[in-house]
Amino acid sequence: MSDAQDKLLQGEMNMTLNMTFMTSARDAVGKCLAELGDKHDDMLVLTADVDTSSRIQAFKEKYPDRCYNVGIAEQNLMSVSAGLAHEGFRPLAFAFAPFASMRCYEQVRTDICYSKLPVVIIGNGAGYSNGASGCTHCGLEDSALMVACDNMTVLEPGDPFQIAKLLEAAMDLNAPVYIRLGREAASSLYPEDAKYEIGKAMIPREGDDGAFICSGIMVHFAMEAAKRIHDELGKEIRVVDM
């Protein structure tokens, strides 16, 4: 594997939110947080000691009194977020994906979802994308756990522009939302002005000989696989981005 590929998988390349460059999901979130804060006076950002990893610096500099680091205590993160939501705030809770789901599952299920509170949970480093930190930081079960919670909507965007639009949609949903993000860098699949609807699939590639149904970073792998199948076998595979 080349150095560039290795950096790509680790999400460590320096990128900007641009159609011709690549960006990681967390960089895309960080870029739009401050703008969301301008629109939502009641928006708060909370982290489990992952400020740098979550790319919240721009928001923190602009709104220092609306950022809270509760420490490496994900159960506390979710309960505090629930309490703030009860008081009329709109919390965004950031943690690594396995800890945002498994370590604090009771608090997510009972404190947030049971009361259908508008808390947006952002799980970073999903899948194997945080593998450099060891198996403890690999989030493979988070989607299944979150989907099982009543009133919870799970989103796994894989396009930088899609991330920004879906984060804004999550803020308007007025219900619990889990956004699953990897560390990998990805290019844009859709134009900046593309329309997204929660629960509706996008079709970045058409085809009648088969289909790949996927989400998140896997959409990019599916697009590459579909291209290779076309080039080597002459078959047209549709890619469905859920």
Question: PLM features: residue spans?
Answer:
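Hydrophobic, well-ordered secondary-structure elements that form the walls
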Residues: 81, 146, 212, 229, ...
